[in-house]
Amino acid sequence: MKTGNQFKTVALVGRSNTPGIAEPLATLADSIATLGFEVVFEGDTAREIGIAGYPALTPAEIGARADVAIVLGGDGTMLGIGRQLAPYRTPLIGINHGRLGFITDIAASDMQALVPVMLAGKFEREERSLLEARIVRDGEPIYHALAFNDVVVNRSGFSGMVELRASVDGRYMYNQRSDGLIVATPTGSTAYALSSAGPILHPQLAGVVLVPIAPHALSNRPIVLPDDSKIAIQIVGGRDVNVNFDMQSFTSLELNDTIEVRRSKHTVPFLHPIGYSYYTTLRKKLHWNEHASNEDDKAS
């Protein structure tokens, strides 16, 4: 738990193209400003909701100026701004205005009660890891990207299986025929990797997971690797192969291109209300233990 007022400037970021988001964002901005904080808006958010009276900044300007960013939206909004603010280590507070909300853990109905308490310094902090990836062609890097959730190499919707050659730390692992291969962080283990039968990794676990997508051989199973592993995935066969970084696509892959993935040097601080439990999030989002229960998150 952290205490003590350590924030002066608060940035607000909203989910784009979302009806009904303008009013809660404006209300939140006014209430935070009333408490004596400087409030700034992410530029696209400010323009979309038509708010005036607050500075509208680029993500880079937010990173240089804001002490914390509050994200009102879904997990995708949190992932997007998290990647952009990662080099600045700007802490994020997530308010769920989307559907699933694995990483935007504060309900919109609770934000007016919880946000002032957190801005006063009462919160729980954790660091989330990212992946950095590059595409190498003929020995030269042609593209770089960061990923919060995952790097996914997969076939297009109209092509057949792809053949991928995977190696870890320079050591050959296997050739795999499948619809693709996912490299996921612990945060991303509850995203696409989970729907492909991958394991759930606790966010504080120092690991990454490799998850095949519909492999031809059932013996190709997910594997958890140390988070300092250097993973290389080479395109050996197939056509119209894509690589996605948190679903941001690069579609011009060629045979023998290699996607190199490793843990990023950047981490993103997440701030949670006091009493936050990752297990509560899993239980609610995955509908575990749906029968009536009086159990709480205290150790028995």
UniProtKB/Swiss-Prot annotation:
Protein name (record): NAD kinase
Predominant cellular place of this UniProt entry's protein: cytoplasm
Family stated for the protein in its record: Belongs to the NAD kinase family.
Cofactors, names only: a divalent metal cation
EC number, as in UniProt: 2.7.1.23
Gene3D superfamilies linked: Probable inorganic polyphosphate/atp-NAD kinase, domain 1 (3.40.50.10330), Probable inorganic polyphosphate/atp-NAD kinase, domain 2 (2.60.200.30)
Record flagged with keyword Transcription regulation: no
GO cellular component entries: cytoplasm
